[in-house]
Amino acid sequence: MACRYPFSPAKVAITRFFYPSPLSRSTTPLFCPPSCRIRVGNTSRMLTSSSSVASENPKSEMAKFLASPNPKSSASEPGPSPHDVLSAPTSAGHISEAEETLSDQLRNPGSSSSSSPSQSSTNNLSSKNAPFKLSSTYSLPSNISVPPEVREHLIEWSKNVLEHSRYVIQEAQKKFVGLGLKVNEMTGYQEVERLKYMVFEKEDELQRLREHARTAKAAYDEAVAARSEAQRETNILLERKHSWTDADVSKFTSLVRSDHTSSHAVASTSIALKDAEIAVDKSFSQLMQVILQRYHEEQVWSDKIRSVSTWANVAGLAINFIIFVGAVLLVEPWKRKRLVEKLEERVASMMERVDHRLEGVEGHLERVAAGSASASAIKEQHSDAAIQGVEDMPSNSTANPLEFVSPQTIPLMAAVDPTINGSESQSDPFFTQTIRGFPNYLDPLVKPSQKRDLAVAGMAGAVAAWILIGAVRLVRA
């Protein structure tokens, strides 16, 4: 496979692997090497694998086109590079497909979403290798299929939004600048700005005049040096006046002429130097005057700002005082009244619930009182009957009085007096001291009871058993 860019053996093997022959099952190349591709944006549509196509079908139009390329297009546009070209198919059918796809793309440049995968890969490569450029329109990825109408609407909408945002930003900047100018005009800072620029101008003028004075001083020094040199040479010639020659006479004449010229130059340069020094002094005094004016205006402006800030602080304090007085005289009584009303409503609702519950408790107490009265009456009747029975049987003096009570009346009596138990009698606890300072749920262990005695006995037995086991182990050891 002959290409414009030569292959290495490894690249040839890879190309043969990824470019199957037309007789194989798959005719679509899986991978396109970067050296055998077609450029998308080039109207000449130059293929790098021209020799292979021409050798396969020498009578095809593509082979003729490749055999005789357009000199204008080939001269105006460079050859394809490995980064901005598409894959080139290896058969004539593939070439025709690529040609049709390229012609469709040239006809419809906007419909890039319906292009082939090879074109999308080329777009991705060109976008990666191209330099970063901020676009003013919104561009969708190429792998998303969007109808052309929707894409056009999106592009138009993005352009409108971008233009509107730019317009808003520009207007905001203009308004901020105008607001700053108005504030400066109100506070008198424009005069300070004018004097500041005047100070800069005076400084530049002073620098320029100083440079001019230095130049005049250099010219004056040069003229003085030339005059001194001419006078020195004249004095040397006058010392040997008796031995002058024609050359010495002409030299003396030129020296007198140069001395006269240098004297005039010294006079003119001295005047220019004096004028330059006077201008420098005048400019310096003007600069000092402008600096003093600027300082004065800045002091006046700072005094205005300070007075404005003072009055603003006073106004803020007055507003805060008014708000405080209003809160104390108006808001707080209203809040207090509202709080009292809510509290009264809650208390009334709570009292209603309490009254309802008290009515239920009163009914329950009435039922308990009736039950206790009936139980006491039954107890009196049975006690009278027991006394009568004891009188009738004096020999059975140790009998339990509850034996004469019927089993049906014992629960009623136990409900009134819990100490009554028909089955067995309770004995007094062994420990009668109450331990204080513990919560209510520890009453069985704190108050004297048989349960506490049993618990203490169990704990004592456990301690005794532990001591006994320890003693046995100690003896065995």
Curated annotation (Swiss-Prot):
One of its GO terms (cellular component) is mitochondrial inner membrane. GO terms for biological process: inner mitochondrial membrane organization. It comes from the Eukaryota. It is a multi-pass membrane protein. Residues 476-477 are mitochondrial matrix. Pfam families: She9_MDM33. Disulfide bonds: none annotated. Homooligomer. This is Sensitive to high expression protein 9 homolog, mitochondrial. It comes from Cryptococcus neoformans var. neoformans serotype D (strain B-3501A) (Filobasidiella neoformans). The lineage of its organism: Eukaryota, Fungi, Dikarya, Basidiomycota, Agaricomycotina. The gene is SHE9.
